[in-house]
Amino acid sequence: MSHRIPAIVAITLAVCTVSGVAIFAQAPTSPGALTRSRYLPEYTATGEMKLPPNSIWREWVFVGSPLTPNALNGGQANFPEYHNVYIEPGSYESYRKTGVFPDGTIFFKELQLTLGPSENPDGSRTEPSGRGYFPGAFNGADVTVKDSMRYAQTGGWGYFDFNHNEPKAATTKVRSKSECAFCHIASAKRDEVWTQFYRILDEVPLPDSTRGGGR
């Protein structure tokens, strides 16, 4: 006599906390379900954001790297000089599927100076590949976090400066609306994000409910 053991499919949603970071793990059980865990921002007891540990942002999804050389900006660019931008992978996966940046989204912009010394007034130099700009030393970081409730006064996003030099600050306070959010609200293309400068973000279709209405 043969016996058949019925298959049991377990669908789980696990939430755990590790070192003050909420990590969500969800099995891919339905269309749109996330297939990876998410790293969410950590804060101190006084509300300062903590620098993500162990340079983990360098393992995230690379979005792009605009360049604002000091030599082309009066000797001191506002964000010198390479803007190496990464997005937390779970947030990117959700954005690709929905066209919406979910709460908890983290953009990490690691600044990096051009390789010196420059050989020309515009700050460029010549290497075997040609004349141009080449990445040099790291130079601090800026971080943007989406939290519709915590940052309701600045359009749902919080902006953080972890120094524009090395070493990066271990913690930092959210910036005021006039320092960061105002410019994003006025000029960024989609949900206060400069998607117009990052092709892999800009090519994601808008949700049907907002199609054609992005900034």
Describe the role of every protein-language-model region.
Residues M1-T12:
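Bacterial N-terminal signal peptides that target proteins for export
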Residues V21-Q26:
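Juxtamembrane cytosolic interface motif at the C-terminal end of transmembrane helices
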Residues P31-V100:
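N-terminal secretory signal peptides
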Residues A27-R36, I56-E59, T98, P102-R215:
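Sequence context surrounding c-type heme c attachment/ligation sites in exported
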Residues A10-G20:
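Bacterial N-terminal signal peptides
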